[in-house]
């Protein structure tokens, strides 16, 4: 494994440790591995010429196996005379040069700098049973003796489970005593434990601690490895501790998922990082559903690049639907992150292999199937990276999805939400180079289609004079997709878009082919200030649309910002649209209390309010009118039915689509007061 797992869930680690040791008793120390499991690390850090001190040998075979592998200068000590006598009898003939001495490791009688390696397999964990002051005093004596008897440049090599109090002590004590400290996740031991304890779903990560003694160190040297040769270097001890804890927390997730199903509960999320990187390379969402006839056991689903923002892959409810259609009791949904390079699907599977295996239900030994939408990892190309003073960092990306090329505006502050999306078509002209063109008939956001029905109603049915252009105000431009669509589909409309961020106008013009003309212009201004000015100057619009998001992601309402629903703002809108106009807003609200409050505020100002809730999104399009004839849902349905059919017709007439984009009957059936 070369990926560091970090879970987003919290667990009571102390309880888990207690259960681990209670369950195993004396057998807990079998968990530290044998020579074959540790030999890669031993050979890397200990040489046959080293003078080795084995601390607390007990009845371990480790020193015997090392002796048989040409490590001949080994001195074993143990506080138990029974253990020492037994080991002497066992090794006197076959390993005559190996020494066994009864000695307390906290008060050794060896001269200073006698050894080049001090080897500890579980002895520290046996000594350091709790964080009591008297225990800590014993451990400090233990380390002082180790460092006293160790030569400069010598190594303390320790196999440990690194309980929290042990880890905290090591990262503080050893650097303070001029030791370079390296901690390596020992995957070989874990794999062996899985094989030897196949019936035991409870697993704990094992670590090798390597502390190298120096005369002096001007600054701490702290490193962490995931079992490969690549080390991550830190400047702060807390960073090293956090790396270890990330592996331990992930193990708790793996153990919990191995031991029980989470069917009926929320999904569990895991992020995977490369060493030395602060942004995740993969995110994994683990879902369970109850066992049933026809369901297979376990699979992983790899979402191609750029598709992770789609409802099916980017939301908990979408992923549940994906699991149901895939027909697996457990599904691990893997998403790939931007600013990472992924070559082939096979390479991604290989990189994920250890983690995906660790997430399997207990006892699952079959090969794990990998599912995806195709045979590759998808394509994501960044066209530009930019910065907005209002919205922060943003990207313009092109992704391949379902045989289409989509151009997207993404704000990195909320990068799983697409701010704007356009369909890119390739135009072939005989004798000329192919060029890309934005398809203005493509509406990525479904709520834009339902807002457009309202615009059709306000500009044709409410004001039927064909020779008079109808004025439409859109607050919030983004990439300009909605405005470009309205401009192309409704030639009798005259559109004013208000955008607070001047960078967004540049983006819309340069990357989404937004074009201003006599029927469409953009005003750079604060939307609320513009609305107030229109009211004060007696400027009217046939339709007003709020399609603006909140920059405060902590609030339960994402669209619009709460200030846009203030009573005085709504009164301004009421005057601006006049007796025949229509006000529409995109309401995105996860908090039911806030949502109810928002609708109530609208109903206080407008005599007629109705809404349409999108099926797969949390978006709800709310329509508000001053015309009291719309007080019943039947009147809304009649007017919206005519407007919807008219919108379908004009879209096809202007060659923006070949088929009706709006399912009129379904739309009308879901309209609610």
Curated annotation (Swiss-Prot):
GO terms for biological process: methylation. Gene3D superfamilies: Vaccinia Virus protein VP39. Its EC number is 2.1.1.-. It catalyses: L-lysyl-[protein] + S-adenosyl-L-methionine = N(6)-methyl-L-lysyl-[protein] + S-adenosyl-L-homocysteine + H(+); N(6)-methyl-L-lysyl-[protein] + S-adenosyl-L-methionine = N(6),N(6)-dimethyl-L-lysyl-[protein] + S-adenosyl-L-homocysteine + H(+); N-terminal glycyl-L-lysyl-L-glutamyl-[protein] + 3 S-adenosyl-L-methionine = N-terminal N,N,N-trimethyl-glycyl-L-lysyl-L-glutamyl-[protein] + 3 S-adenosyl-L-homocysteine + 3 H(+). Keywords: Methyltransferase, Multifunctional enzyme, Transferase. The lineage of its organism: Eukaryota, Metazoa, Ecdysozoa, Arthropoda, Hexapoda. PANTHER family: EEF1A LYSINE METHYLTRANSFERASE 4, SAM-DEPENDENT METHYLTRANSFERASE SUPERFAMILY PROTEIN. The keyword DNA repair does not apply. It comes from the Eukaryota. GO terms for molecular function: protein-lysine N-methyltransferase activity. Belongs to the methyltransferase superfamily. Dual methyltransferase. It catalyzes N-terminal methylation of target proteins via its C-terminus. It catalyzes dimethylation on lysine residues of target proteins via its N-terminus. The keyword Transferase applies. This is eEF1A lysine and N-terminal methyltransferase homolog.
